[in-house]
UniProtKB/Swiss-Prot annotation:
Gene Ontology biological process terms in this record: aerobic respiration; menaquinone biosynthetic process; methylation
Binding sites annotated in the UniProt record for S-adenosyl-L-methionine: 76, 97, 125-126
Cited Gene3D superfamilies: Vaccinia Virus protein VP39
Family (UniProt): Belongs to the class I-like SAM-binding methyltransferase superfamily. MenG/UbiE family.
Role, per record: Methyltransferase required for the conversion of demethylmenaquinol (DMKH2) to menaquinol (MKH2) and the conversion of 2-polyprenyl-6-methoxy-1,4-benzoquinol (DDMQH2) to 2-polyprenyl-3-methyl-6-methoxy-1,4-benzoquinol (DMQH2).
UniProt GO molecular function: 2-methoxy-6-polyprenyl-1,4-benzoquinol methyltransferase activity; demethylmenaquinone methyltransferase activity
Catalytic activity annotation: a 2-demethylmenaquinol + S-adenosyl-L-methionine = a menaquinol + S-adenosyl-L-homocysteine + H(+); a 2-methoxy-6-(all-trans-polyprenyl)benzene-1,4-diol + S-adenosyl-L-methionine = a 5-methoxy-2-methyl-3-(all-trans-polyprenyl)benzene-1,4-diol + S-adenosyl-L-homocysteine + H(+)
Listed name of the protein: Ubiquinone/menaquinone biosynthesis C-methyltransferase UbiE
NCBIfam families in the cross-refs: MenG_MenH_UbiE, PRK00216.1-3
Keywords for the protein's UniProt record, in alphabetical order: Menaquinone biosynthesis, Methyltransferase, S-adenosyl-L-methionine, Transferase, Ubiquinone biosynthesis
Recorded name of the encoding gene: ubiE
Pathway this chain belongs to: Quinol/quinone metabolism; menaquinone biosynthesis; menaquinol from 1,4-dihydroxy-2-naphthoate: step 2/2; Cofactor biosynthesis; ubiquinone biosynthesis
EC number: 2.1.1.163, 2.1.1.201
Amino acid sequence: MNQPGETTHFGFRDVPLNDKQTMVNDVFHSVASRYDLMNDLMSGGMHRLWKDVMITTLNPPRDDAPFRLLDVAGGTGDISFRAAKASGAGFQATVCDINTDMLEVGRQRAVQRHLDGQVDFVEGNAEALQFPDRSYDAYTIAFGIRNVPRIDLALKEAYRVLKPGSRFLCLEFSSVDVPGLNKIYDLFSFKVIPEIGRVVTGDAESYQYLVESIRKFPKPYDFAEMMRDAGFARVNWQMMSGGIVALHSGWRL
C-alpha cells in the first residue's frame, strides 16, 4: 500500500508515486504509432540484434510441445512475433501491456503477420497481473520494466505467474562501461534522441523522459539483487554493445 506523500522518479523529476503510471501511459499514447520506427532510429537498428539475442537465450521449443510465453510491456508485439518465428506449433504468447494504443498497434500487426491465432493481446498492469499462479513457461519484458512505478512488485508478479523450472528474461538499457563511449552516448541520448522524437513524432518531451528513465534504472548488480529478493535463482546478466543494454536472466526453480 502506498504511503501518503510517497514519491518516485519520472525521468529526473520526483513525482507522486500514484501519478507515475498515468504519466508513463501518456508518453506511450503519444508515441505508439511510431514506436518501432523510433527504436530503429534511436538505436541504429541495434535493437533488432539485442532482441535476437533475447530470443536465442529464450530458446523456445521448435517442435509441437506446448509453450506459453507472457510478454509484459510488449504492446506492439515485437518480442512475441520474434519468439513465434523461432518456435514450433505449440507456441502461444500473451502480450500484456497497460497502454491500449500500443496493444492496438500490436493486434493489427499480428493479423498482418497471420499470427493472431498464436499471439493474443490483453490490457494489464505488471504490478498486479490477472493471470493464475504458475501458468507460463517464460516471461519476457523488453525495455519496459524501467517504466514500472514499483519494480519490486513487477518482479514478484513475474515470479508468481511462472511455472517452476521456467525463465524470466528482461532486456533493458544499462550503464555504458567503455571509456569515451559514455560521453558519446550521453551526447546522442540527450541532444539527438529528443530531436529525432520531435521530427518523427512531434513529441520531444516523451523521448526526453525515455532517455532520463534509462539513467535512473538500477545498475545491473542492483537489479540482480532485486530479482533474487523476488525469489529468482541462477540470476545473471549479459552486457551488450559496450554496456548500452543488458539481458537479465533468472529462473523460478
